[in-house]
C-alpha cells in the first residue's frame, strides 16, 4: 500500500461559552488543521493538529500548514502501514515541527486500523480500559467562581481537576487553590495546579509553602526545565512537566535524572501516536503517572488521545483531556468523542472510529498527489 494523496484542511473552532483563559493567552476561537491521507487502495485516514494560538508553545496554525506543505510531496508513495518508517521519512524531509508530523502520523494510524479492521488502541499495544478517565481544566478565574466550577465538575464525575494559575498576583492563586480544596476535600478527586510556565520560582515556592496540607501536584510551574530543577527539592508537592516535555530525549533526561514526578503530555507536541506509545512505555518503566492530552482540536485529535489513553496502565493514568466541552459542532454526530460522567468511552469502529462530515471543512487549502 502507498500514499496516493494528501489533503490539508483549515477549520475554525469557536470556543463555546468562551473565552478559555490560561496564563499566556485568552482564546475565543482557534483554527485547526486536518489532514486526509488517501492510499492507492482508496482507503483514507484522518489526522489533526490544533495549537492553542501562537504563544502557548512554539507552534501555530500557519506553521503547521507550512510544515505539511514542505513534507507532503516527499510522502507520496510512502507506506502508511509502517508508522515508524513513515516517521523517519518525515524526519528526513523536515527538522523538528513535531506538531505537524503528528497529524500525518495520526492519519496513518487511522488508515492502518481501517485496513486491518482493528481499533488504533489495539495497534498501540492493546486496551487496558474501555472507559477512559478524563479530567477537567478550569481556566483562570476568580477564586469563588473557580471553586464553584470545581465542585460542579466533581459532582459530574470527573476523577481529577486541573486548576489553572499564573499571570496575576500569586496571592490570588493561593486563595483559589485553598477555596477549591475547601469545596472538594473528602471527595477523593485528584488535584493538579497548572502554571503553564508562568510562575517565577519565587512564586512557585511560595504557593507550595503556603498550601502544604493540600495534596496537589504542581504542573509546569516555571518556564524552563532548569528553573524547575532548581526548585525541585524545595517544594512541598510533586512536580509534573508539561510544556518542557518537548520530545522523547527530554522525557528520558527528566525521568532518568528525577526532575519530575509525572507528565502532562500533549500528543502532537511529542510527534504523534508512534512517539506517544514510546513515551507511555518510558513512563511505565519508571512508574511515572501521566496524562494523554492535546492542546486543542476536534473529534479526530480527541479520538487519538482517547485511543492512546486507553492503553495506559490504569494506576499511572492521569486521564485524557479533550476540548469537546468547548466545541459546539462535532465532526461526527454519531460517533464523536463525548465526556460522560467524567469519562470517555473508547470508540468502537476500526481506526480512530470517527467518520468526519467533510462538508464541515470546505475545500482543502492544499492537496498533493
From Swiss-Prot:
Catalysis performed (reactions): trans-4-hydroxy-L-proline betaine = cis-4-hydroxy-D-proline betaine; L-proline betaine = D-proline betaine
Binding site for Mg(2+): 194, 219, 242
Residues at the active site: 164 (proton donor/acceptor), 266 (proton donor/acceptor)
Result of knocking out the encoding gene: Cells lacking this gene grow more slowly than wild-type on tHyp-B as sole carbon source, whereas growth is normal on cHyp-B. When both hpbD and hypF are disrupted, P.denitrificans is unable to utilize tHyp-B or tHyp as sole carbon source.
Cofactors that this protein relies on: Mg(2+)
InterPro entries associated with the record: 4R-hPro_betaine_2-epimerase, DgoD-like, Enolase-like_C_sf, Enolase-like_N, Enolase_C-like, Mandelate_racemase_C, Mandelate_racemase_N_dom
Keyword annotations of the record: Isomerase, Magnesium, Metal-binding
Enzyme class: isomerase
Residues annotated to bind substrate: 56, 162, 295
Source species, domain of life: Bacteria
GO BP annotation list: amino-acid betaine catabolic process
Induction of expression: Up-regulated by tHyp-B and cHyp-B. Repressed by high salt concentration.
MF (Gene Ontology): amino-acid racemase activity; metal ion binding; racemase and epimerase activity, acting on amino acids and derivatives
Co-factor binding details: Binds 1 Mg(2+) ion per subunit.
Disulfide bonds: none
Its EC number(s): 5.1.1.22
Family according to the record: Belongs to the mandelate racemase/muconate lactonizing enzyme family.
Protein's name in the database: 4-hydroxyproline betaine 2-epimerase
